[in-house]
Regions:
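Key DNA-contact positions within bacterial/archaeal DNA-binding proteins
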Residues: 23, 34
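Short, cationic-aromatic polyanion-contact patches
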Residues: 1-6, 21, 52-76
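Alpha-helical residues within the helix-turn-helix
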Residues: 27, 44
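Amphipathic alpha-helical dimerization/coiled-coil segments
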Residues: 73-104
Length: 104
């Protein structure tokens, strides 16, 4: 499953803290409130999160965002893929610097 970077960032945030409101996510990630809402709905439709309504939540957030087992699995796969991409980029940059140093 291909997931957008924005969706991955939201998965990471709610995995750390399911009590974050949409406004909290918007503020912490630098996304518009509409974008956060759209991403959460998309993640819900893909079966990666569950959205529970808790009106008596002490921090007055009406919703609790919970990663499903599928969401946790997908987040893990994406994290691994992201790390592999970063390692590859690091190796490429390291080789470029090495080549540049040899030329000078």
């Amino acid at each position: 499953m291909k997931i957008k970077r924005e969706h991955f960032n939201i998965l990471r945030k709610i995995h750390k803290n399911a009590n974050l409101s949409q406004r909290d996510l918007s503020s912490q990630l630098g996304y518009s409130l509409g974008k956060v809402n759209y991403c959460l709905e998309s993640l819900k439709q893909k079966g990666l999160i569950k959205i529970n309504n808790f009106r008596k939540n002490p921090n007055k957030s009406n919703y609790l965002y919970i990663l499903t087992p599928r969401g946790i699995s997908e987040k893990t796969k994406i994290t691994l893929r992201f790390m592999q991409e970063r390692i590859k980029e690091y190796d490429e940059l390291k080789n470029e610097l090495s080549t540049h140093k040899k030329k000078n």
